[in-house]
Every structure is written in C-alpha cells, then in structure tokens.
From Swiss-Prot:
Gene assigned in the entry: hisI
Region called Disordered, residue ranges: 1-23
NCBIfam families found in the cross-reference section: PRK00051.1
Pfam family membership, one: PRA-CH
UniProt-recorded name of the protein: Phosphoribosyl-AMP cyclohydrolase
Cellular-component GO terms for this entry: cytoplasm
Subunit comment: Homodimer.
Molecular-function GO terms, alphabetical: magnesium ion binding; phosphoribosyl-AMP cyclohydrolase activity; zinc ion binding
C-alpha cells in the first residue's frame, strides 16, 4: 500500500553516492548511511516526547521531509517512497529534524494526527514491553 505515487523511486544505494544529492552539502556529508544508503529515522511527538515509530530515509526522503512539512520515508521492502498519512489520513506534520552525534540516526519531531502505527495504535511501541531488571541510582 503505497502512500505516495510520484515520482518513481530511485534506489537508495544510488542516492548515497550521488554528488547531486538533493540535500545541502553539509547535511549530505554528515549522514552515515547503511549499506543500502539509508539512515534510521526515529519519529517523536513534539509536545509529549512520545516515541511513535522508526522508519528509514535516504537523501531524497529526507529532502522531501525537510522541504514539504510532511514526513516521507523510504520503504525497504517495497523500495519506494511513501508519505505518512496519504492513504490513512494519519499525517505527520514536521516540527524539527535533528541528526544524532554519530550521524547515523535522525530524530524527526512531528505533530501526529491519528495513529502512527500501521496496526492502528498511537505508537508502534504499544504493549510489547519486555520484562527487565531495572537499574537504580546509588
């Protein structure tokens, strides 16, 4: 189920080494992409700090996200772009984009409308907590 139809996707691996990256040079050069040319994108609700989901972006998806006000991901399984909410109505409006200290993960802060998860839940991290030994400060 593709949430965005135009334009046809370029394989992410091609974009990672493309000197004509749509991103400003200082951003493109700071990204540490995986072997497929992708960077993890953690999506967080801007006003509550709730972690909503994890998606993947290549240079083009990040460019679209930074210039449209809506979050676009690159689907690893379908190898195409999809903009969150185009078919479901569960839109993610961009509030900020940050790169982590290693350059291999993005934090996309959004205003989420409706469910963030494809299962229909607010967050993709609902109800799957593991039992752990918790640590305490001494």
């Amino acid at each position: 189920m593709s949430e965005q139809s135009a334009p046809s996707p370029t394989p992410a691996a091609e974009l990672s080494s493309d000197p004509a990256s749509p991103l400003p040079q200082e951003i493109a050069s700071a990204l540490k992409r995986d072997s497929s040319g992708l960077v993890a994108a953690i999506v967080q609700q801007h006003d509550t700090n709730e972690v909503l989901m994890l998606g993947w972006m290549d240079d083009e998806a990040l460019h679209r996200t930074m210039t449209s006000g809506r979050v676009t991901f690159y689907s690893r399984s379908r190898q195409e772009y999809w903009r969150k909410g185009d078919t479901s109505g569960h839109v993610q409006f961009v509030k900020s984009v940050a790169l982590d200290c290693d350059g291999d993960a993005l934090l996309i802060r959004v205003d989420q409308i409706g469910a963030a998860c494809h299962t229909g839940t607010r967050t993709c991290f609902d109800g799957r907590d593991f039992t752990v030994v918790t640590g305490h400060r001494e």
